[in-house]
């Protein structure tokens, strides 16, 4: 549950109600670089959206959380876009639009550090690195931001902040699983 004073996002939707199993899949995909998980996770995502169509039809666009893949990046592939690309093949009726939020450079990892350290990174270097390169694509729209794991909401808050400043009317999160320290 989000305990942020001003989260900037309306709510968080969680795809999987079996967090340990989904965490294992995310770890294998993201850190083990087993890219075959992209299709599986894309199918799971579309199944979740289809089952709850009434809840998600209100969103105008579904985008990915910001990932940096340039020089000095920790990972040279956009694991969230691969999932949304797979989801778009399974559910072309959903308004998937990866990459509407840009991250201009690498930031420190959140995995394995304290919530206070994650908050400092989010409110410092992450906030400074985020932008919306094409604001016309989100102005006046309700945006759903897809990410793999939700911990305390620090990253999502910063992405919601930049989207709202660029003209989005509402921002919510959509994550595969929740895990403290994820």
Model feature map: region roles:
Residues 1-182:
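Glycine-rich phosphate/pyrophosphate-handling loop used in enzymes and phosphotransfer proteins
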């Amino acid at each position: 549950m989000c305990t942020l004073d001003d989260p900037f996002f309306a709510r968080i939707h969680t795809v999987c109600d079996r967090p340990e199993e989904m965490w294992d899949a995310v770890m294998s995909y993201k850190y083990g670089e087993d890219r075959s998980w992209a299709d599986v996770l894309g199918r799971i995502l579309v199944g979740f959206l289809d089952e709850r169509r009434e809840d998600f039809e209100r969103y105008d666009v579904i985008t990915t959380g910001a990932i940096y893949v340039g020089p000095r990046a920790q990972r040279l592939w956009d694991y969230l876009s691969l999932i949304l690309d797979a989801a778009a093949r399974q559910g072309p009726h959903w308004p998937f639009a990866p990459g509407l939020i840009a991250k201009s450079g690498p930031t420190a990892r959140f995995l394995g550090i304290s919530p206070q350290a994650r908050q400092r990174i989010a409110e410092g270097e992450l906030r400074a690195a985020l932008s919306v390169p094409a604001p016309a694509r989100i102005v006046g729209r309700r945006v759903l931001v897809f990410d793999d794991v939700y911990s305390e909401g620090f990253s999502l808050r910063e992405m919601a902040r930049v989207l709202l400043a660029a003209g989005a009317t509402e921002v919510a999160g959509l994550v595969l699983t929740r895990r403290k320290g994820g």
